[in-house]
């Protein structure tokens, strides 16, 4: 009986030992990263500005009406001079008259628009998007009356023709570029007009309309009238 006492005591000590605490596992919450959203261009307003005017620009065979310096480039409007009253190259019977030229710092022509034909006025006006530094150029056209303007996009040293804004305010004292508002979004470039009434196809059909949110929209492919 005495031999059982030490054995019982050892057994008691064995069970009285503190049980090791099990590590508590905290459930890990899986966090799914959100897919990066595409950058959305908020409506950016193009504001008119006046670039540096260049005097005495010499372009062989070209009669310069207006010339400007922008970001190291020259932008000039005018027309190639006829020889003895005849159309000569680079003009052709289908491509002559007032046009826009882009020249690099070596005075080389890197872009020329298609000739618009005859006009007393073909004057560039400049509008800049401060978000991306793109520039819209609208060449105001006129005979004895104003008759719209051609729109171009100047982006990173490249020129692109957008289309013809065949519209004017219904007031012969002011012109297209006096009422023009330009805005850009991810959907394209919108041209609107600060005038109660407008004339479509001025100089030809002269169709007078109310300005019920009339606009031209360039949708990255073509320039279209919405009315």
Report each predicted region and the residues it spans.
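Acidic, small-residue rich beta-repeat scaffolds with periodic aromatic anchors
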Residues: 17-66, 154-164, 171-227
């Amino acid at each position: 009986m005495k031999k059982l006492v030490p054995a019982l005591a050892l057994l008691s000590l064995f069970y009285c030992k503190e049980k090791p605490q099990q590590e508590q596992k905290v459930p890990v919450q899986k966090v799914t990263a959100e897919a990066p959203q595409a950058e959305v261009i908020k409506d950016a307003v193009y504001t008119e500005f006046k670039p540096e005017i260049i005097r005495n620009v010499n372009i062989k065979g070209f009669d310069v009406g207006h010339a400007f310096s922008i970001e190291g480039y020259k932008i000039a409007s005018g027309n190639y001079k006829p020889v003895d009253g005849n159309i000569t190259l680079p003009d052709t019977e289908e491509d002559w008259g007032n046009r826009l030229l882009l020249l690099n710092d070596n005075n080389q022509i890197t872009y020329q628009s298609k000739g618009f034909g005859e006009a007393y006025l073909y004057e560039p006006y400049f509008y800049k998007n401060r978000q991306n530094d793109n520039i819209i150029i609208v060449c105001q056209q006129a005979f004895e009356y104003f008759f719209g303007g051609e729109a171009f996009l100047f982006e990173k040293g490249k020129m692109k023709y957008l289309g013809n804004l065949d519209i004017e305010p219904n007031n012969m004292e002011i012109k297209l570029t006096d009422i023009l508002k330009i805005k850009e979004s991810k959907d394209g470039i919108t041209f609107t007009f600060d005038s109660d009434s407008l004339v479509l196809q001025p100089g030809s059909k002269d169709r007078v309309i109310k300005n019920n949110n009339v606009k031209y929209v360039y949708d990255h492919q073509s320039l279209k009238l919405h009315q």
